[in-house]
Regions:
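Generic start-of-chain signal for non-secretory N-termini
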Residues: 1-5, 66-72, 162, 174
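Intein-associated homing endonuclease modules of the LAGLIDADG/DOD-type, together
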Residues: 86, 109-325, 334-335
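Long, charge-dense accessory insertions within large macromolecular proteins
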Residues: 65-109
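The Walker A/P-loop phosphate-binding site
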Residues: 2-64
């Protein structure tokens, strides 16, 4: 047998750049192609199937996130957990416009759902977090002063996450009234569950009482005003608000959240919701504004809503809190707005 040396065919740029990552492809795993050769190499073969949400688009726009993640679309913020509940196992055609960065959007094509055994929790010093599969590429600024896509599983302490702000993507087709949005904000902050048959918001701040009272009047609702609370006994309005909240069973401090009708609303409605929410449960000093909540989900949602508006905040917690003479042994979250972002908050939200 005669062996002949064969001249190597010159490799394309894609083949050369992807050679290292191609070697790391895992055996015995199924993948979905991202539609981009280099991205498939970075991922080790494509998008790995798992108990995750794969919102798949072109180039680096796909997501391999666990169901707790939130994405920003032309219909507003969408919790992948909500999609996870309503879509079947496997791959489903799924088209929605997805925000990638400021001024950059893309159209998704599919949603994939399946079991995954491993994921990586990534957290920045400002409290921005994401839970993704180890192969998921994230854009980072490295210690070597380079902007690169790195697998989540290979991130190091000191890598700087590149996070887009001021994407300004809202659902302008939303018909949520701004007076109703304000009432929802105050209710989420200091209200009881409307399932008890009334709207009842505890506050001694006279200016807040007046704002809620007038907002209800503008909606044609008869309000009541007392020394320590404001609300309404209007059954039809109470049921409307309860439905907008998603008919919650638990509505205590640790179970509060931003309703989907607000996450999917216009900028104006989101801004007045945040104004009502934060005015009720915040304090300020000469350094900034501090919003306080017992709900991790609510703190995270507020952080993302503000980021979309261009307001960068810090989110952190402390274990336990003394309220009056009683000690509550669970986490309390703070969203801190300071510096020029406090000025921007005042300008956009008030």
């Amino acid at each position: 047998m005669e062996l002949k040396r064969r001249e190597a065919t010159p490799k394309t740029e894609e083949e050369t750049q992807g050679l290292y990552f191609a070697r790391t492809k895992k055996e015995n795993l199924e993948f979905i192609s991202s539609g981009n050769f280099l991205l498939d190499c970075v991922l080790g073969g494509g998008w790995p199937l798992g108990r995750m949400s794969n919102v798949v688009g072109d180039k680096s726009t796909g997501k391999c996130a666990v169901k707790s993640a939130t994405v920003l679309t032309n219909e507003g913020f969408v919790d992948l957990e909500d999609l996870h509940k309503h879509l079947p196992e496997g791959i489903t055609p799924f088209e929605i416009e997805l925000a990638i960065s400021k001024g950059n959007k893309t159209q998704t094509s599919h949603f994939y759902k399946e079991d995954v055994m491993e994921y990586v929790h990534v957290e920045t010093r400002h409290g921005y977090t994401i839970d993704v599969t180890p192969n998921h590429p994230l854009l980072v600024w490295t210690k070597d002063c380079e902007t690169v896509m790195k697998r989540a599983g290979s991130l190091e302490v000191g890598d700087i996450a590149v996070i887009s702000k001021a994407t300004h993507m809202y659902n302008q087709d939303s018909d949520l009234d701004i007076n109703l949005a304000f009432i929802l904000g105050v209710l989420v902050a200091d209200g009881i569950n409307p399932r008890h048959g009334r709207i009842d918001i505890s506050t001694r701040r006279e200016y807040l009482q007046e704002l809620v009272y007038n907002a209800m009047l503008s909606l044609g609702v008869k309000p009541f005003l007392r020394q320590h609370n404001v609300g309404s006994l209007d059954r039809r309005f109470t049921q409307q608000v309860y439905n907008l909240l998603g008919c919650p069973i638990e509505f205590t401090a640790r179970n509060k959240y931003v309703p989907n009708c607000v996450l999917n609303a216009s900028f104006e409605a989101q801004a007045v919701f945040l104004r009502g929410l934060i005015d009720c449960d915040s304090w300020s000093d000469n350094k900034g504004l501090y919003y306080y909540t017992a709900s991790e989900k609510l703190a995270t949602q507020v952080q993302l809503m503000l980021l979309n508006m261009g307001i960068v905040v810090s989110r952190y917690f402390k274990d336990g809190s003394n309220i009056g003479e009683k000690f509550y042994d669970h986490k309390y979250w703070t969203v801190s707005i300071s510096g020029r972002y406090f000025n921007l908050y005042s300008e956009l939200i008030g």
